[in-house]
Amino acid sequence: MKLCGFEVGLDKPFFLIAGPCVIESEQMALDTAGELKAITTELGIPFIYKSSFDKANRSSGKSFRGLGMEKGLEILAHVKREIGVPVLTDIHEIDEIKPVAAVVDVLQTPAFLCRQTDFIRACAQSGKPVNIKKGQFLAPHDMKNVIDKARDAAREAGLPDDVFMACERGVSFGYNNLVSDMRSLAIMRETGAPVVFDATHSVQLPGGQGTSSGGQREFVPVLSRAAVATGVAGLFMETHPDPSKAMSDGPNAVPLSRMKELLTVLKELDTLVKRAGFLEDNFGWPACA
């Protein structure tokens, strides 16, 4: 699959989707995007900047949701133009798709909406690549149905059907907790879509602070190493200059100052794993019969 001018897949280096959870200000967006571009350029990692103009699924109705679509898209367009990086943002309603697709390079669907057929179809018919997040309630093999819906819709519109990614972001484990089953990354490859691992939402504790979500950012390096060792096409990470002051998802955000050292380790591991290949491709019962 070609994405934003670079090739993605298990036979290619991982690409990175990264940025603050929500757009807090234009200057912070520009500064963060510029720093991430410098890091990824030095390390040779293809990079897409992400940030949300609206967080429509906050725990509390009193929590900061964002700057709104009009202002948010204006800032993302400025980041794209000024910093020279492709940009991604998420949409939550069908009527947001057209104006957002006119600005960004990649759309993203929230995990909670992965079963909403009309929404997935509308996103697929936008003409943009779509990062489709797997619901916290969904089995990994069920993502094949979601990707198939997107592909069918794209073909019906006369659009390419190979522009969709399947993103793992953890699965609910009791109340206010998520776990990551690394088998799901291999299972989701059966969709035929590039698999992305969301390393920061996977350590989220949904609603764990009462009116907001908690998180365990100390496990981001652990799970991201595990995902890269399993084999993924891309990584998704939210990062912030000062997570303690972040207006959304600070507890699970990677401090911007730590991104380079984390990505350096992951880049080395990714190179090693992909050079060795993936035994599981022919390790099942049929191959052993």
From Swiss-Prot:
Molecular function terms from GO: 3-deoxy-8-phosphooctulonate synthase activity
Pfam family for this entry, one: DAHP_synth_1
An annotated GO cellular component: cytoplasm
Domain of life: Bacteria
Catalytic reactions of this protein: D-arabinose 5-phosphate + phosphoenolpyruvate + H2O = 3-deoxy-alpha-D-manno-2-octulosonate-8-phosphate + phosphate
Pathway: Carbohydrate biosynthesis; 3-deoxy-D-manno-octulosonate biosynthesis; 3-deoxy-D-manno-octulosonate from D-ribulose 5-phosphate: step 2/3; Bacterial outer membrane biogenesis; lipopolysaccharide biosynthesis
Subcellular location: Cytoplasm
Gene Ontology biological process terms from the UniProt entry: keto-3-deoxy-D-manno-octulosonic acid biosynthetic process
Coiled coil stretches, renumbered: none
Disulphide-bonded residues: none
Keywords: Cytoplasm, Lipopolysaccharide biosynthesis, Transferase
SUPFAM superfamilies for this protein: Aldolase (SSF51569)
Class of enzymatic activity (EC top level): transferase
Enzyme Commission number, as recorded: 2.5.1.55
Primary localization: cytoplasm
HAMAP family, sorted: KDO8P_synth
Family: Belongs to the KdsA family.
PANTHER family to which the protein is assigned, alphabetical: PHOSPHO-2-DEHYDRO-3-DEOXYHEPTONATE ALDOLASE
UniProt protein name: 2-dehydro-3-deoxyphosphooctonate aldolase
Species of the source: Cupriavidus taiwanensis (strain DSM 17343 / BCRC 17206 / CCUG 44338 / CIP 107171 / LMG 19424 / R1)
Designated gene of the protein: kdsA
